[in-house]
């Protein structure tokens, strides 16, 4: 548990350092919404089928001199139970660092990764929710349009739950204003 707190604290400090870049005036803040399919894997994939997710995001882009931005995502996932098993709902709040590859004009590929809080609950009477820490990593691309942009990304999420970790892969399509 202490190791997770140290890793989380280091992540937050790195994000704060990235946001205090002297070229902060070149940064852009965006609000966005997204949705897509969620593919459960591992033990979670044994119990549930492909589901869906919706996501809200607040993004601060990197600058020309430091192409590292920060993004806070809130996401809801619904995974259908297999056979007669219950559906599983996963709420997340993640802080992520985003490295945008330089040189992109209308299309900018990026790498994203971070950590956050995951609340998981089976949709059945008497089930208790579980609050856990998790991490995520993925790749995506941002597509600049007039006055807004769209994005597509795929990420791997690992939730450190007890007794087994839960993994899922959301494929996301969204819009940023």
Q: Where do the model's predicted regions map?
A:
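Intrinsic low-complexity/disordered segments
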Residues: 21-23, 50, 150
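Transmembrane beta-strand segments of Gram-negative outer membrane beta-barrel proteins
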Residues: 26-39, 111
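Surface-exposed strand-loop-strand hairpins of Gram-negative outer-membrane beta-barrel proteins
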Residues: 38-55, 130-131
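A short acidic/glycine-rich loop-to-helix N-cap element
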Residues: 44-47, 161-166
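Gram-negative (and chloroplast) outer-membrane scaffold detector with strong preference
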Residues: 52-125, 132-135, 143-148, 153-154, ...
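A short, acidic, flexible beta-alpha connecting loop/helix-capping segment that sits on the rim
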Residues: 155-160
């Amino acid at each position: 548990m202490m190791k997770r707190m140290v890793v989380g604290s280091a992540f937050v400090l790195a994000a704060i350092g990235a946001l205090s870049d002297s070229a902060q005036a070149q940064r852009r803040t965006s609000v966005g919404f997204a949705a897509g399919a969620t593919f459960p894997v591992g033990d979670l994939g044994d119990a549930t089928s492909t589901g869906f997710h919706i996501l809200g995001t607040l993004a601060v882009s990197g600058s020309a001199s430091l192409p590292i931005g920060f993004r806070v995502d809130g996401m809801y996932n619904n995974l259908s139970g297999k056979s007669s098993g219950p559906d599983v709902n996963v709420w997340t709040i993640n802080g992520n660092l985003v490295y945008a590859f330089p040189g992109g004009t209308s299309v900018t590929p990026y790498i994203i990764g971070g950590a956050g809080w995951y609340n998981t609950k089976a949709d059945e009477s008497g089930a208790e929710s579980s609050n856990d820490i998790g991490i995520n990593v993925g790749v995506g691309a941002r597509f600049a349009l007039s006055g807004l942009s769209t994005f597509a990304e795929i990420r791997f999420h690992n939730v450190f739950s007890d007794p087994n970790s839960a993994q899922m892969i959301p494929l996301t399509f969204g819009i940023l204003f």
